[in-house]
């Protein structure tokens, strides 16, 4: 039998790959791990969701209504939570290294503060060894509260000619402008 590693029979080799970093890119911002909150227009959300490539499936969790679910393609396991308790249960049973959660304000209508606190602490705990991206296309008070407890918050706003990006993490605030790609212009012949 051919042995490409030229090992002797009976010799065991342990290869430690370690935790491979799971990374996505929100426009020009690289997201590597932790509990990340992202507020961005739908086209930007679909771009980073569809830009996620891995042979291991990611978990995509949404609530009662989803703006992005119809537009995603790729290796995703989709779960829906219709109450905050179902959402917590889904996250407790999640095994994926990459977890995308689409914010749904309706899940928090009858939610007491202790349940909301448990939910946020669960997101932070999962983010210790995995990547959690909690995102929305429309900010509200609940989402804004969650961003104060996230490891990183990325705000993307559409402007004429591009996107304004504000990134807040433990290092501070980083602001930048990401220009939209404009098609090539041609000059008229005189």
From Swiss-Prot:
Name assigned to this protein: Uncharacterized protein AF_0694
Organism listed in the record: Archaeoglobus fulgidus (strain ATCC 49558 / DSM 4304 / JCM 9628 / NBRC 100126 / VC-16)
């Amino acid at each position: 039998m051919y042995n490409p590693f030229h090992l002797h029979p009976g010799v065991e080799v342990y290869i430690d790959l370690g935790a491979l970093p799971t990374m996505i890119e929100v426009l020009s911002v690289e997201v590597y791990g932790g509990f990340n909150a992202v507020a961005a227009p739908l086209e930007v959300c679909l771009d980073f969701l569809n830009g996620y490539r891995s042979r291991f499936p990611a978990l995509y969790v949404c609530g009662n209504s989803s703006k992005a679910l119809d537009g995603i393609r790729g290796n995703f396991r989709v779960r829906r939570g219709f109450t905050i308790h179902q959402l917590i249960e889904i996250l407790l049973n999640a095994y994926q290294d990459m977890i995308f959660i689409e914010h749904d304000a309706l899940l928090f209508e009858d939610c007491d503060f202790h349940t909301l606190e448990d939910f946020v602490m669960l997101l932070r705990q999962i983010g210790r060894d995995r990547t959690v991206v909690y995102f929305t296309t429309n900010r509200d008070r609940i989402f804004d509260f969650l961003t104060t407890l996230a490891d990183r918050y990325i705000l993307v706003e559409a402007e004429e000619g591009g996107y304004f990006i504000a990134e807040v993490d433990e290092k501070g605030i980083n602001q930048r402008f990401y220009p939209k790609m404009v098609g090539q212009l041609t000059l008229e012949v005189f």
